[in-house]
Structure formats: structure tokens, C-alpha cells
From Swiss-Prot:
Top-tier EC class: transferase
HAMAP family: PIMT
Protein encoded by which gene: pcm
Family, as annotated: Belongs to the methyltransferase superfamily. L-isoaspartyl/D-aspartyl protein methyltransferase family.
Places the protein is found: Cytoplasm
InterPro entries per UniProt: PCMT (IPR000682), SAM-dependent_MTases_sf (IPR029063)
Reaction catalyzed: [protein]-L-isoaspartate + S-adenosyl-L-methionine = [protein]-L-isoaspartate alpha-methyl ester + S-adenosyl-L-homocysteine
EC number: 2.1.1.77
Entry annotation: catalytic residues: S63
GO MF: protein-L-isoaspartate (D-aspartate) O-methyltransferase activity
Name under which the protein is recorded: Protein-L-isoaspartate O-methyltransferase
Main location: cytoplasm
GO cellular component terms attached to this protein's record: cytoplasm
Amino acid sequence: MSDVWQQQRQRMVDEQLRPRGIHDQRILAAMANVPRHLFVPEALQAQAYSDQALPLTLGQTISQPYIVALMAQELLLNPHEQLLEIGAGSGYAAAVFAELVRKVVTIERHQALAQQTQVRLRNLGYVNIEVVWGDGSLGYPTAAPYHAISIPAATPQLAQTLLSQLHDGGRLVAPIGDAQDQQLIRLQRQGQNWQKTTISNVRFVPLIGAGGWEHAPETTAEGE
């Protein structure tokens, strides 16, 4: 059966990612290697390599493969770097990032989900991922600074506390906008200045916490 899953991953890379502009060979290799079917509910495993977000528990989702690959590519990642992910979900994106950087810190606000994800990642052999339980909307200063920050959840603005946790030269990718429609952007720190790049129009689940929304607004989303 492992060969079947591997074939599905390779088909995902060849049919969903390459044609849509994912060209970084390290990212394509990571996407072909990480077993997405082990990060979704068992009842949805047959859909694991389809081009769609899938539901998890507690109202969370796992991002569609293209979005994970796109965010990884836009973060301009290097092997020696440390990355912060806000919103661990099932740990799929963290696993992809872990194949691209030295260390991943991923923070999840749902304690039960954080615990499940920690066990899953440990069982899959990911030793360079730290799963933290807490409000990630303000980042995680304990392990800062970071070379890259990934926020796979929509927020109306970015907290200065979060931005200050980036290294000089560091990059942050996040969907910014209202609860229904956002723009995926990259901010790159240049001293006290920021270079902004708009990537695409997107629709993600909301970022809940002190640095995002206090309560979840109604939305339909493609993000994790």
C-alpha cells in the first residue's frame, strides 16, 4: 500500500504543484515525501492527495497541498534556518517545513490537538519539530528570533509583538484581510523597514487570539 500512497504523492506533485508554479526542487521533494494521508482523519484518507483542504477536529482544517507548497516557496527557506508556524493543526505543514529548515516551532491553541500532533510527529520521526500549546497570534517569544514565520490563518492585522520576533532579513507569509477574503502577502524585514510582496487572493480560516479575532467569524476557507 505504501507504493500506492507514494504514487499518489508523486501525482499530486506533477499535476497540482508543478503546473501552478511550484518550482523549488527541495519543496517538490518534501511534498513527495511527507505522508499527508497520515495527517487527516482515517475516513478522509482516500482524499488526502486531492487538491483541497480537509476538515480536522475542533473546527480546524488541513490546508490544500498547493497552499502549503506555495507558502513554503514564498518563505524563501534555507536549510540552516528556524521557522515559526502559527496554527499547528494536524502537523502536516510543519512536517513539510521540517524537511526544509533546521528547526520548526509550531504553536497550537487547542491543547488536545497540540498533544495529538506532538505524538503523531514524534511517531513519524520528526525530531526537529517543537509543538507548543498556546495563543500563537502573538508569536512565541521564548524561541525567537526566527528566520521565517508562517501564518496559515487569516488575520486583519499583524501584531508588532509578532513582527519583532523576526531576524533582520527574515520573512513572514500570512493571509491579511477580513473574515471572507484575504491577500496572501510576504513581509521581509530590513532593519526597521519592511518590504511587502502581494502573492495572491486567498480564503483561510480565521486566526483566533489576542493578535487576531477574539471569536471565530463565519467563513469558508482553503487554509489550515
